[in-house]
Amino acid sequence: MQTVAKSWSEPYTDLVLQPSTIRMLLGVLLLLLGTGVYLLDRSWQQLAIADLIPLTVTLPPLFGVLGGNLPSFAHVSAFALLTAALLDGGRRLNPIICLGWLSVDVAFELGQHPKLAASIANAVPAWFRDVPILDKTPNYFLSGTFDLLDIAFATLGALTAYLVIANTQAQGVCHEDRSL
């Protein structure tokens, strides 16, 4: 005998997302958000792929004031969540993952500081010039703008990622702790 669901949501009550799936989905969504800022709010000429996509479309800023710093938040939190989803390393590794991605973002932000940018751009290996996208590396440092708010947003992104990771573990939906 076939049973009939009592409500539209009843068939889905057994659906449980694993922590790695939650982290992966949120990470991908945050990556899309950060990418969306670059594609929708920034000039195409600023993009590393500008030479590959010959467009001259100009749109009004969709993300407004937040558009300047939102990628720092989105990318740090996305990469931390994606890394935590792939490694599933336990409570001891998760803060290291978040701090690691924060450190990468802060290093690139500091590299745009006027006192450091020229030195770093000159230190880029010569072979980068022959690799699409990598050939833009010196311009990233020379044309970029150092912004303390980017560091603040990146810090908020790392903290947010850590809270998401810790929360999925605290709710008992994570496998046993595989500490270092």
Can you say where each PLM-predicted feature lies in the sequence?
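Bulky hydrophobic segments
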Residues: 1-180
